[in-house]
Swiss-Prot record:
Domain description: The IMP cyclohydrolase activity resides in the N-terminal region.
Protein name: Bifunctional purine biosynthesis protein PurH
Alphabetical list of InterPro entries matching this protein: AICAR_Tfase_dup_dom_sf, Cytidine_deaminase-like, MGS-like_dom, MGS-like_dom_sf, PurH-like
GO cellular component, one term: cytosol
All copies of domain MGS-like, residue ranges: 1-144
Catalytic activity: (6R)-10-formyltetrahydrofolate + 5-amino-1-(5-phospho-beta-D-ribosyl)imidazole-4-carboxamide = 5-formamido-1-(5-phospho-D-ribosyl)imidazole-4-carboxamide + (6S)-5,6,7,8-tetrahydrofolate; IMP + H2O = 5-formamido-1-(5-phospho-D-ribosyl)imidazole-4-carboxamide
Single annotated GO MF: phosphoribosylaminoimidazolecarboxamide formyltransferase activity
The species this protein was found in: Lacticaseibacillus paracasei (strain ATCC 334 / BCRC 17002 / CCUG 31169 / CIP 107868 / KCTC 3260 / NRRL B-441)
Amino acid sequence: MKRALLSVSDKTGLVSFAKGLIDRGFELVSTGGTHRELAAAGIAVTSVEEVTGFPEMLDGRVKTLHPKIHAGILARRDDPAHMEALADHDIQPVDLVCVNLYPFAATIKRPDVTRAEAIEQIDIGGPSALRAAAKNSDSVWAVVDPADYEAVLTGLDQDDAHLRQKLAAKVFAITAAYDAQIVHYLDPEPFPEHFTPTYTKRQDLRYGENSHQQAAFYVEPDPNPTSLAAAKQLHGKELSYNNIKDADAALAMLREFSEPAVVAVKHMNPCGIGLGKTIEGAWDKAYAADPMSIFGGIIALNRPVDLATAEKMHKLFLEIIMAPAFDDDAYAVLAKKKNVRLLTINTADTPAELGTETTAIYGGLLIQARDNQTETPADLTVVTTVKPTDEQLKALAFAQTVVKHVKSNAIVVAQADQTLGIGAGQMNRIGSVELALTQAQQNDNFAGAVMASDAFFPMDDCVDYAAKHDIKAIIQPGGSIRDKDSIEKANQYGIAMVTTGVRHFRH
């Protein structure tokens, strides 16, 4: 008779799976709570103690860790010496191991969890039995996920070796992820000696950045509730690879603002950001910032969408609209377009709470702290004769907040509540200045605009160009060996200039 070892913390589907195994000629061996569950259902089951001749001990820490279990799992059926050793020690082979692991991740999510409670949820016997079965998957079934029970029963009928190998790989993936979560809990160092992240596939994507590239979306085991991975899609087509990247960028920008704000993004750069007393007012500012580029854009709002705002957005082709909520009548209007993706998001986090970010390179990975720096008035140094007005300081602070989210070389022209022109990704800074000002001057709200730069001005040509296009104040990090030239040029034109001492490159 074949033997199956069952020891599960998640009892989903257990009884029907056990009955299926019995129907296929298996003897069931089980531990603790699993044994009680099966016995209560009237299923014949043998306890592990009866097999090993040794009781469970240490409050259940030692149950299946015994040669009569592990030898039965690990013995190679095609090796006469292995089978003879089993016979000599009166050990029966174990042909299927069904184990799922203690809920460590769920335990550490509890805000009041103690270290002792977390440690008790580190499974030892479960991973050991599963890994043993997976190692010997030429003969032994390793089952870790209740979602696989039906497939396993069918696979047993067909002696499906391919499925057995696939499930073995799944075991090693899940136990590796499980161990990674334990590592991170015990040592949450952001730059550890060994970096062991773990992600689970959320979905296969139609394609990647371009149609000839394959892609999939993976998420952390327990995504931050304010992350895009935790957003809920209410309506529209499936998110694409580019949608996900753009939406994440939009959400990062949105976190910067506490007042009603609307962020519009194209190709991971902002094309319009507006602030207002109401979310409708913020939308009006964001739209007016660049009515052309917003077409086909990703929109993020930090207040619920009301009917008036929805009716305005509905007039445009937009890829995504994200907000904390949608009023019922607003949702009804927006959902008339079957393809627009409507997502609810949580915007509670501030940028300072977001930890690290990673960038893959060929053969490696870069990890850095996110650019959470936000300059305060105390960080600013006025370096020109002319000092900025209070209103200009507000506009400079807003432009400075936006510019760190723009691809370098980055220039932002703005008022205190609205971007007017954005120059992104140019290989020389004057090119970004020209782009930003060309766009900004088309805006009816241009008079009195200010300019922000993500890095210092290597020459005074940027200030010269800004002055000729009526910029009244500039904020930049400073630090160039030619700072003096730019400052003198600003003084010549009567422009107020403020330095921060902080660069905000974005690649």
